[in-house]
Amino acid sequence: MVTPLGDGVETSWSRILSGQSGAGEITRFDASNSVARVVCEVPVGDGSNGTFNADRYMEPKDRRRVDDFIVYGIAAAQQAIEDAGWTNPQGEEAERSGVMIGSGIGGLPGIEESSVLMHERGPRRVSPHFIPGRLINLVSGQVSIRYGLKGPNHAVVTACSTGAHAIGDAARLIMLDDADVMVAGGAEAAICPVGVAGFAQAKALSTRYNDTPEKASRPWDEGRDGFVMGEGAGIVVLEELEHAKKRGAKIYGEIVGYGMSGDAYHVTAPAPDGDGAFRAMRAALKRAGMAPSDIDYINAHGTSTPLGDEIELGAVKRLFGDAVSQLSMSSTKSSIGHLLGAAGAVEAIFSMLAMQQNIAPPTLNLENPSPSCEGIDLVPLKAKERPIRAILSNSFGFGGTNASLIIKEFTE
């Protein structure tokens, strides 16, 4: 994974648990006229101290031809594939290995830059690499080409549910016997003038904490006023269970539930009654054959918006009933911001780590919880050790698209 806390799973996870925030002022462009000036950028550097060094993953000439969401996606995929030991499948193994990596927005910075260039200097100045360097499916395409993965080559585009949908859909392809191995997840890098302006004009971003960026993302807190844009990528390798066991693969968890729903309500606002979120979670539980009381930890969508946080919390309480008092729920967006199309995949990885290590990551800045938070452990301010055998991870997106994943501890 690549996140605003750094490059790699260990770096990001250790910093999440220690309560660090990836939020800061915008550095990519002059944001002095921007209403919202707080974002969570990937820390770029020479690779030391967890900084992201793109040269570790791509040749400079190749990197210049693509937008950063593709760079982040390739980097996260390389980490995942190397960790899984699946770097060079051959023959039928290659034909039964696929890719499903999506993005909510894709190459928006490059589109913006090329549009300005064309209008200022004419169409002949547009790069021949412009189209393949911005298309959302080109993360999957690049990874497929790089590792010779000849199975399903697909991309998901469902706004902020993209990463979760990609993992869930890829798991279903394996269940349907279309593949034995799928590289799946999401990548995003849309922090650019038009991207920030668009979300800000939609009144979606935090503006109250421009002078104290680390305080801006505060799910369920009474002082929340919008989400903080983030960027990065989260990629996992999914594998048919017997196939994984046969080759002695390291198994982090087992995907047992996947639920989807549509709000059919509004292009940006969630349905006020939370019914879409409720039905996605219920469908995931049904698919898993589990009761609400079987879930120990929920990684909430929890974006820090006044409306969305409240609605998700209500849906969780409605579905889980009395069992809600026994679980822990937190939002890692309080640390890394909202990674949009990459969020669901990154959060699924964090959830698996929480399960492996029996520790729930914290919800930062939850200093004054909303009254509706009573009766549920939202892991305020500090990580919490507790038994975690099964997790549920929520992702909800513009257009009313909802996804819930359930992953449980793997046992023989």
Task: Describe the predicted segments one by one.
Residues 1-62, 242-254, 349-363, 408-412:
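ACP-dependent fatty acid/polyketide chain-elongation machinery
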Residues 2, 21-25, 35, 210-288, ...:
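Condensing-enzyme catalytic core mediating Claisen C-C bond formation in acyl metabolism
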Residues 31-45, 108-110, 189-217, 259-279, ...:
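Active-site-adjacent elements of ketosynthase-type condensing enzymes
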Residues 73-86, 136-139, 144-188, 227-249, ...:
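Active-site-proximal alpha-helical scaffold in enzymes
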Residues 80-94, 244-251, 281-297, 319-323:
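Phosphate/pyrophosphate-binding loops at sites that engage ATP/ADP/AMP, CoA/4′-phosphopantetheine
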Residues 89-94, 288-294, 325, 374-412:
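Flexible, low-complexity linker/loop segments at domain and module junctions
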Residues 120-127, 165-168, 172, 176, ...:
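Glycine-/small-residue-rich "gating" segment that lines the acyl/pantetheine channel
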